[in-house]
Structures are given as C-alpha cells and as structure tokens.
C-alpha cells in the first residue's frame, strides 16, 4: 500500500492499457446499446432503493448487469464499448454522450440518490482522512441489490477500458478488497 503512492500515474495508465489490450475479445463486433430517459431521471427527488428508482443508474441496470462479462471486453484502450441514446433527444454518440453518461452514473451512485453506498464514519464526522468516501451498504444483500453491485463493477470496468477515469468515491479499504490487497489498520 505504501508503494502505491510512489508509482507515477503514467506508469499506472500504461499497465491498465496493456491489460485492456491483452484481455480484448476481437470476435465481439456488436456494441452494447443503452437507452436512457433523462426526463424520467430528473423527476426523482428522494433517496431510493435501486428497484424503486427512476434514475439513470436504475435505467442502465438491466444492460449493465445482464450481458455476459465478455461483452465488456471489446475495444482497445480509450474506445467506447457502449453506445448511448437518450429518449426524445437528438444526438449521435461519437463519444461525448458515452463520456457524459459514465460521469452522470458515477455522480448518481455517490450523491445519496441511491442507498447502494453509505458514507464512511470519517465522511459523516468530517474528520481525519478519506473524506467524501463511501462503502457498500452491508444491509443490501437481496438479488436486486447484488445485481446493482455487479453493475457497479462493470461500470468500473467500462471506465478503465475506455480510459474515462471517473470518480468512484470508494473508501481505500474497499479498493484494497477489490484489488486483493491485504487490509491493514492504516
């Protein structure tokens, strides 16, 4: 963990790009499509369960959680792996809609609109380090929530593969668990 801060970002990006290239599936030609309704998402005002939400993440959940994981392995580093279309809006997704949508999905996940993630005690108390970070809600272990967490993982993968470095405000110990780093008391 202590070495992690000393590795230059360009080195990290090169390693990630190498991993994307080596795991790329060349036989996948069909791009996933995502159709969203911004007006429906804007009507939501209170934090809700994923199954009751009309937000963008809940609308995207079916597409993000249902395809086989291999569908997300198409493309080279920086290529968009999914096309985005918004209901009632005219636009060609040449990358901008994709980038904006990934950012909006991340923002929604950590805004309090959904109950998938909870603020860390440090965030609540506004003290010490790792402020503004979140942990998965441990009380959510039903099938719909587990599907939503799977979709979050795929959203992280989409961000890495397309080199859209979005802000997933997960606490450092959550990242450590996701990357199989031994946990410490730091």
Regions found by a protein language model. Give the residues of each.
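Conserved beta-strand elements of beta-rich interaction domains across eukaryotes
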Residues: 89-92, 141, 156
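Aromatic/His-enriched, Gly/Pro-containing loop or helix-boundary segments
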Residues: 130-142
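Extended amphipathic alpha-helical bundle segments that form the ordered cores
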Residues: 145-152, 157-186
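Alpha-helical repeat scaffolds in large eukaryotic proteins
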Residues: 8, 106, 110, 135, ...
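Extended low-complexity, proline/serine/acidic/glycine-rich cytosolic segments
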Residues: 1-131
